[in-house]
């Protein structure tokens, strides 16, 4: 029951031969700068993919803390874990991870209501034109979850066979997980504790060495995983940062862990809209990773701190533990591979964590890079890779911006998001509210497909039932849609009966 949308195919499967070196000298040497989530994923992916054909050096300051809000992921993380030979159960046992079945949007229409955006769709094979979902909307019985059903999400249950057949991912503690992953590979990686301060380049502009306080490190290929610092990429020439703050103006996050004993553990990440942004709530086994995202264009830092403190008091009976605020830039590098250097994760760009796309992007980058790279740098590969990554970000920003298209106008922030919509959002909204999208609406590699846009549109209450009904009748698929809908409900009922409480499920691992 793999999602056709969250998980991209990797042409090389486990157990296949290791790619031979294109030269007879020493193994090709990758130097990864950064040891956070992105650095850990990249270095272990490279080693798992190429084995002894490569040497992977990871350099980072071991004393520097990561952001550590708590990572909400997509099923792409399961693809990564399979590649590097780590079981999801390991992260649950040792890193406070929990199961994630989707996302809960709360108060995005301003009335306190909520809707779910789950991952896969059991109806996908037949529902490529959205017929089953449209039938459910017309008849008032569509619950936005074509896989498990809202009962499982509302009651925080997990199918007992989730690891074998389910479409799922994890909520993780990013700090613990990156340490765990690197420790698993400590005998296969060269891990160095140092602070990188500069680089040297050859006459072609390629990096020769990265320079740290303790030493200099040469390599064949360098990867910038330094997060918001963008340490290597800021020193490269002929690149530009594409600012997307006109689409997504949020530029601050207030992190605050909530330590409490769970009576029950949610199976969804909650994104709760406020009058000037939204609050992220990621359930881990030992805490809730929370963060308040807002824009300084519409509220001051102090106002945001005060509002977040009130929210924590009212919802969790606790107070804001610090006044730490993390600034960020909404945007991405036009080119994310230049010469013999690539940027990954937050070094390559930032999208607010509404749909957990940042870690997804790291893994997608590694899939694309390792599938096309054979230890020799060609401009053709660079150009194609960069175009793929620009397209990725374009699709992400389109979907994230569409999530704000709920019609709220109860504050200056929401008036801006509603009245100052980009033209692409206007035309998309006009289309999908009257006529459903299909598999041909977006490129096949797109991270978000027709089903995702449909679920958000329905969650916002913007689907036109009369128009949908007429389309089903005109296409002559009403009876077929009804039959498929009924079959899907039976299957969801079966899955529900084989599910148990999330907290109880975690305790069995």
Specify the residue positions occupied by each region the protein language model found.
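Conserved mid-domain beta->alpha element of the FAD-binding
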Residues: 331-396
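Glycine-rich FAD pyrophosphate-binding loop
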Residues: 47-69
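Low-complexity, highly charged intrinsically disordered N-terminal segments
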Residues: 114-180, 184-185, 193, 225, ...
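N-terminal Rossmann-like FAD-binding beta1-loop-alpha1 element of flavoenzymes
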Residues: 28-54
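Conserved FAD/dinucleotide-binding core of flavoprotein oxidoreductases
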Residues: 274-327, 349-360, 375-378
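Dinucleotide-binding Rossmann-like beta1-alpha1 core, especially the glycine-rich loop
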Residues: 65-154
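Long, low-complexity C-terminal extensions of enzymes
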Residues: 371-509
């Amino acid at each position: 029951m793999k999602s056709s949308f969250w998980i991209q195919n990797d042409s090389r499967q486990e157990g296949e031969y290791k790619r031979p070196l294109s030269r007879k000298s020493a193994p090709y040497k990758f130097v990864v700068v950064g040891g956070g989530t992105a650095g850990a994923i990249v270095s272990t992916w490279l080693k798992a993919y190429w084995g002894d054909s490569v040497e992977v050096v990871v350099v980072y300051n071991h004393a520097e803390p990561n952001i550590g809000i708590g990572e909400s992921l997509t099923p792409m993380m399961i693809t990564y874990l399979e590649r590097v030979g780590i079981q999801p159960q390991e992260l649950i046992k040792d890193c406070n991870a929990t199961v994630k079945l989707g996302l809960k949007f709360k108060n995005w229409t301003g009335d306190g209501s909520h809707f779910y955006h789950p991952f896969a769709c059991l109806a996908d094979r037949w529902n490529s034109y959205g017929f089953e979902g449209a039938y459910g909307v017309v008849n008032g019985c569509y619950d936005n979850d074509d896989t498990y059903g809202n009962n499982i999400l509302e009651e925080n249950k997990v199918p007992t066979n989730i690891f074998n057949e389910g479409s799922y991912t994890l909520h993780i503690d990013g700090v613990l997980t990156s340490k765990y992953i690197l420790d698993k590979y400590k005998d296969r990686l060269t891990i160095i504790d140092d602070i990188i301060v500069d680089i040297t380049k050859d006459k072609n502009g390629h990096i020769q060495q990265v320079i740290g306080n303790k030493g200099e490190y040469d390599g064949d290929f360098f990867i910038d995983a330094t997060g918001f610092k963008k340490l290597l990429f800021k020193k490269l020439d002929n690149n530009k940062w594409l600012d997307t703050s006109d689409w997504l103006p949020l530029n601050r996050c207030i992190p605050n862990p909530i330590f409490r004993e769970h009576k029950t553990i949610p199976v969804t990440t909650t994104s709760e809209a406020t009058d000037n942004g939204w609050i992220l709530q990621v359930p881990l086994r030992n805490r809730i990773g929370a963060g308040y995202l807002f824009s300084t264009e519409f509220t001051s830092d102090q106002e945001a701190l005060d509002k977040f403190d009130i929210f924590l008091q009212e919802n969790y009976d606790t107070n804001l533990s610090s006044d730490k605020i993390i600034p960020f830039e909404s945007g991405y590098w036009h080119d994310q591979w230049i010469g013999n250097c690539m940027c990954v994760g937050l070094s390559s760009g930032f999208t607010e964590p509404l749909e957990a796309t940042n870690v997804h992007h790291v893994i997608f980058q590694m899939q694309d890079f390792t599938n096309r790279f054979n230890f020799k740098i060609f401009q053709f590969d660079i150009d194609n890779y960069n175009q793929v990554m620009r397209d990725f970000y374009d699709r992400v920003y389109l979907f994230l911006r569409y999530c704000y298209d709920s019609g709220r106008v109860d504050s200056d922030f929401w008036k801006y998001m509603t009245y100052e919509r980009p033209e692409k959002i206007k035309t998309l909204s006009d289309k999908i509210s009257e006529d459903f999208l299909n598999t041909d609406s977006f490129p096949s590699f797109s991270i978000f497909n027709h089903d995702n846009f449909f679920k958000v549109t329905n969650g916002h209450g913007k689907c036109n039932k009369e128009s949908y009904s007429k389309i089903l009748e005109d296409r002559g698929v009403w009876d077929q849609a009804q039959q498929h809908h009924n079959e899907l409900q039976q299957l969801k009922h079966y899955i529900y009966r084989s599910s148990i409480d999330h907290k109880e499920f975690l305790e069995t691992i």
